Amino acid sequence: MSGGSSCSQTPSRAIPATRRVVLGDGVQLPPGDYSTTPGGTLFSTTPGGTRIIYDRKFLMECRNSPVTKTPPRDLPTIPGVTSPSSDEPPMEASQSHLRNSPEDKRAGGEESQFEMDI
């Protein structure tokens, strides 16, 4: 059995230099998924431990990109979440809410979970 092992080498590349970004006090920071260094650099960490370092100019360009203003395809319609909610609730929902008051439930034989005699 001749098991010739073929080993291929990948070309080496230089590690990209990190740039520090100083954020002004008036700039809102991104969500809590990101971390900052004392110098103001934004970074996140992948589950494998790789650090992804973001530069402020790139983030600001992404923020104003037309892609960020375009919703994803096949997004379900969820009022108030993926589409604006209507100003007035439907009449049936508001009337059913009034009919299902706590007093009606107790009268129907359903008691509260915690009952206490003082």
UniProtKB/Swiss-Prot annotation:
Cross-link (Glycyl lysine isopeptide (Lys-Gly) (interchain with G-Cter in ubiquitin)): 57
Tagged with keyword Lyase: no
Residues with Phosphothreonine modification: 37, 41, 46, 50, 70, 77
Subcellular localization, as worded in the UniProt entry: Cytoplasm; Nucleus
Entry-annotated residues carrying Phosphotyrosine: 54
Impact upon substituting residue 69 to R: Does not affect ubiquitination by the BCR(KLHL25) complex
Bias (Polar residues): 1-12, 34-48
Residue positions where N-acetylserine is found in the record: 2
InterPro entries noted in UniProt: EIF4EBP
Ranges annotated as biased composition (Basic and acidic residues): 100-109
Residues with the Phosphoserine modification: 44, 65, 83, 96, 101, 112
Keywords linked to the UniProt accession: Acetylation, Cytoplasm, Isopeptide bond, Nucleus, Phosphoprotein, Protein synthesis inhibitor, Translation regulation, Ubl conjugation
Domain notes: The TOS motif mediates interaction with RPTOR, leading to promote phosphorylation by mTORC1 complex.
Function: Repressor of translation initiation that regulates EIF4E activity by preventing its assembly into the eIF4F complex: hypophosphorylated form competes with EIF4G1/EIF4G3 and strongly binds to EIF4E, leading to repress translation. In contrast, hyperphosphorylated form dissociates from EIF4E, allowing interaction between EIF4G1/EIF4G3 and EIF4E, leading to initiation of translation. Mediates the regulation of protein translation by hormones, growth factors and other stimuli that signal through the MAP kinase and mTORC1 pathways.
Name used for this protein in its record: Eukaryotic translation initiation factor 4E-binding protein 1
Native organism: Homo sapiens (Human)
Gene that this sequence comes from: EIF4EBP1
